[in-house]
Amino acid sequence: VTHELALLAATILLALFQLMLAARLATRERGMAWNAGPRDKAVPPLGTYAGRLDRAFKNLMETFPLFAAAVLIAQATGVHNGLTIGGAHLYFWGRVLYVPLYASGLPYVRSAVWSLSTFGIVLLLAAAVFSAA
């Protein structure tokens, strides 16, 4: 297993953790009946921390398919180098840091970390595509 695939697997575990944490906080606020029910009726917005963790998870889901595709392109082209490894690390560790930064409400640092993690995707993809050419 390459570093990039290991970090892809680690990101899946991070996503599961974020999903369960956000769901737990939402259930704490809205109750078990809401969680077990069909959720047909509109509900008020989540509170501060539950809402932030829900949005952090949704943000991960927006970028994760791009990261996964970039890793798989690198694997398919046989490109495995410092740039692909570095890009995968930037993405994963940026996403790890993003969760507590978003939960704490720290705006500019959170955005900078998001930018670094997104740059990791670009780095990984560029290294895979241009090294294979």
Predicted features, each with a name:
Residues 1, 40-47, 77:
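Helix-boundary and loop/linker segments of multi-pass membrane transporters
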Residues 124-133:
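Juxtamembrane boundary at the C-terminal end of a transmembrane helix
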Residues 58-71:
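Core segments of transmembrane alpha-helices
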Residues 97-119:
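Interfacial loop-to-transmembrane junctions
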Residues 2-39:
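N-terminal signal-anchor transmembrane alpha helix
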